[in-house]
Amino acid sequence: MQERFPLPLVSLLAASFAVLSLALFGADPAGSPRWWAQLVLLALVFLALLLRYRVTDEWKDFAHDSSVYPRRPLQRGAISVRTLMLLGIAALALELGGVVAVSGGPGLLAYLPVLVLSAITAVEFFARRVLARRFTLSFVLHELVYLPLFGWAAFALGAPLTAGTLAGVAAGTLLFVVAEVVRKFEPRFAPDGAMVADTYSAVWGRTAAIVVIVLSLLASALLAVAAGAGVVVTVVAAAFCVAIAALRRSDRAVMVLGGLSVPALAAAMLS
């Protein structure tokens, strides 16, 4: 579980989602009892969603992982298919329970696009062979789920349908694009030593992947300001971009700085 779903890191990402949503769409004062309740529920929904995605990916990518990553938990028998299925069912139940708790019945309807997109993702948009040959298209399609996810968060928190709210949805989406590129930035290698073409640095090249991280950070910060966040978020984003550029030769530095930029920008949006 820890190997494929590191709970501390995933929990930090879930907290970042909740903080960002409250910063851009919330109406209650930060630190109030209702604010904390919403924070916990939003984080819980996102955590459960990520767990459901993890379970889906283990099933969806089983053949690929068995070929190039034979020591992963499912491949080496450390976890059974039955246990994986039970985890997925539990994650879905927790996710839907959190959605209803934070947004009620109407919110469940608003969350439906997230469920539909994630279900289509599980079958690779019914175009597995096509997407296997088009890495960037696959990336874009998979990241689309953040648009309805942040749209649901805005609805759940009572944000009006304005240009500022739409800017907030885009800001959140781009910030979590950073998280995704960072997650699969470092090159991976098959048992025979060959580089596996399933990471962003391997397919796009390190420079292009870093450019995507930096531009997404800056665009997210600017959109957050358009959504009502303070200008301090642009300062924080610029600082991370400069640091990433300065340490761009180190995979570890890019991953650590890129990963830390997500909760840092989310927190800065509260100001």
What is the role of each PLM region?
Residues 128-131, 231-271:
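Extended hydrophobic alpha-helices typical of membrane-associated regions
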